[in-house]
């Protein structure tokens, strides 16, 4: 009986040790960046728009928050700190709409995020009012 109890306890201890030593990779935190409003059009608005990155599923949500006639842009830097890694996703659907961009990123990829407002002019960066973007990047990992 003692021998059976010893085997069971030893096995349980080994299993507990093995489980405590395993690590699972996890995504970073959800981040949100806000764009300044166009105060000439919406003097009382707190923000012109926002961009949110959700690492779980790699979703970029771009929401227009002001009835100002401008689009909201989610500016996302994927994997590095240079302009070569920047991507611009536009929500041109108007106030109170959200564009959901489902990205496919490797786990652990560095992400930087800003939000801006602008007026689409045919190119990803054309028409962006860069003065409405936050000065600092919000950062996380995918």
Enumerate the predicted regions with their spans:
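Post-signal peptide N-terminal regions of Sec-secreted extracellular proteins
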Residues: 26-142
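Secretory targeting and sorting signals
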Residues: 1-27
């Amino acid at each position: 009986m003692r021998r059976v109890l010893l085997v069971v306890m030893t096995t349980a201890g080994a299993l507990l040790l093995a489980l405590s030593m395993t690590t699972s990779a996890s995504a970073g935190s959800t981040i949100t960046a806000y764009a300044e409003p166009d105060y000439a059009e919406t003097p009382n608005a707190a923000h012109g728009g926002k961009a949110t990155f959700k690492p779980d599923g790699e979703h970029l949500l771009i929401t227009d928050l002001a009835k100002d006639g401008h689009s909201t842009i989610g500016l996302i830097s994927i994997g590095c700190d240079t302009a070569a890694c920047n991507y611009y996703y536009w929500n041109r659907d108007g106030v109170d709409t959200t564009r959901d961009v489902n990205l496919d990123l490797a786990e652990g990829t560095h992400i930087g995020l800003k939000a801006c407002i602008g007026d689409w002019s045919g190119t990803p960066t054309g028409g962006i009012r860069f003065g409405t973007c936050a000065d600092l990047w919000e950062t996380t990992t995918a």
